Amino acid sequence: MDSDKLFTLRTVEDTFRIKEFVDEHKPKSAVMVGGGFIGLEVAENLRELGIDVTIVQRPKQLMNPFDADMASFIHSEVRKHGVKLALGYSVEGFAERDGGLDVLLKDQPSIHGDMVVLAIGVTPESTLARDAGLALG
């Protein structure tokens, strides 16, 4: 989908586009698709700007590599800061509505936001470290 309200987050330039949109349009709500390190960081920054944030994550926990006990602690902290969680839901698409975007979920009602950020499948760029002979985990 081509929409000025839908953002991917893979590069520094993507961050600048998100910041420009927030400064210019003053969104009241955002849906973050992805609950890994980057998704949580962006959700935190958007909340600090007073934006209502919902994180949608296909696995039933944030920070999927963590064990369930640690994830439970993270869920509690995130909720304490006003972030809503929609865990265990698959995103099937997006639809423009009411000046924002609906995030269409499989077998669930859609979630509406003034903007949507996709922070999924992001892995660190490690080519330079690998070429330098550094050990990678």
Where are these regions (language model features)?
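A Rossmann-like FAD-binding core segment of flavoenzymes
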Residues: 48-137
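Rossmann-fold NAD(P)-binding glycine/threonine-rich loop
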Residues: 2-3, 12-14
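Conserved SAM-binding loop
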Residues: 7-8, 32, 55, 118
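Rossmann-like NAD(P)H-binding beta-loop-alpha module
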Residues: 13, 17-66, 100
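Conserved beta-strand scaffold positions in the cores of enzyme catalytic domains, especially
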Residues: 6-8, 85-86
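Phosphate-coordination loops involved in phosphoryl transfer and adenosine-cofactor binding
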Residues: 3, 24-29, 88, 97
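Gly/Ser/Thr-rich helix-start
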Residues: 1, 37-40, 122, 134
